[in-house]
């Protein structure tokens, strides 16, 4: 008996019995039952009052591969069963029938799982609705019924023995187990503490060694310091000379430090301007970050909708498989019912033949008793015996014929099943051909009607709800795109306004340069008309020489700024902050140019006043004036080149922003097209291609998305 209960056949038979309850959780194999959800639902159906909804809610459904949660669910189920036996049925469960839950949750042991399902079977056959559950057991196969009945007998026999003599021993065993568990925990804690002490000892030893090494190094450094002090006291030593030389270098470095501090103040002002620009760029970056977060949120929602659509398609295929299995099950039940009726008819025939055989034997006994008295009865008895032999022969012949008919029937049933499968395949192929031969409009309509009939009501509602959410998302996305377009238009207007300002400044600079050239020409004419004296020409030469030195300084400063500007030339697509630095450097350069122009005007006024006072007759400074004019033209060319580079940098930035915006808009459009194609489902599939599967449709949408051209608007130059 115990060998049968522990056999895996018991587990498989009880799984078939659990499937008669039609639970929401799957219970097809051992892996489906290890989490305990299906068994808890079966107990809830067995006795709703005892295993109520609150008890059922304590069983966690989202278990996954976590064996601890599985073990917790199984412990709750076993505790509920033991309470039901003890309090409701007033029975005690034998220790041999209690399963090992750890083996079930960790190893999916079918033997221990069979013991647990055997206890659930005991609850079913002892509850108030036991007749209904016994009727359900009788509907199973004969072999499964035999295994289930054997398990019930084993359960009843072990419950009948009772644990009256083993209560004390079981309590002692439990106390002993608990004491052993406490002892193991204490030993584990002791080992952990010992390991921790060993680690601390190693750390203390390492710190002690480090301390000793530091003390020795400190002593060595003190000795070296004393030697250096002794050597510095003597001025003739090499160390003293090096010390004095170091003092001189220190003074020079201090003077250079003063100069660097002055330059630092200038750079501090420049840094403040850059910080202001950085704050503005940070505000702009925050706005772009918020827009990026919104786009990521929309992308996440799109992924969720895509996952929901995939899940819906998988559930549809699962429903189709279950529907086919249900049809096969109904056919099998009808066949079993017809076989049972035939078996009952054969049993009635056998009983009638046995009754006739008993009557013949009784008649034979009577004929033997009256054989000596009546000879006629003897003859009659012989005739009856012959008749009985004939009937026995006929019965044997009928049995052989019955066996042949049974075999022929089995063969015909197998052929019938094969013909049914062939018929189903031919019908399915015929339906496909009819479906391919219809027109596009009728094909779309029939496909939609078939999908509507196959889809359950809850999936239809979910599909309609997803369509509504898709429309709402499209409206929201269009609003966000309009806002993005408005912002880009504002930025474009601001850029154009900045370009216009720069053009105005350039025109004013050209006018100023023209005025300066006119002043130089006037000065040259005045010098040619009036001439110069020797003393006045020497003073004018000194003034012009000073002026030329300052112009050379300005030219050197301009070259330095050009070098700094070349170093600050950014990669606009990678670091927009460098663009701000370049603009700040350009503005500072313009300010420096304005300051140089003011100084130049001041020098011209001074030179004109000197010329008027001296009234020269000669023109010795014409060469210097021509050189000055040439330097001014070179400076104008450099200014124009820098302005052109600045415009190119701004145009490059503007083009990249437009490319990013166009790519963003195009990706959103493609995502909307892909979402609409997936949500339209079969309708879109019929329009695209009549014989295309779901995966082929997805590949077609992906290829269409890749083949769509991306148009980037060209940047307009001012």
Curated annotation (Swiss-Prot):
One of its GO terms (molecular function) is microtubule binding. Keywords: Coiled coil, Cytoplasm, Cytoskeleton, Microtubule, Protein transport, Transport. GO terms for cellular component: centrosome; cytoplasm; FHF complex; microtubule. GO terms for biological process: cytoplasmic microtubule organization; cytoskeleton-dependent intracellular transport; early endosome to late endosome transport; endosome organization; endosome to lysosome transport; lysosome organization; protein transport. The keyword Coiled coil applies. Residues 164-428, 473-652 form a coiled coil. Interacts with microtubules. PANTHER family: HOOK PROTEINS, PROTEIN HOOK HOMOLOG 1. Belongs to the hook family. This is Protein Hook homolog 1. It comes from Gallus gallus (Chicken).
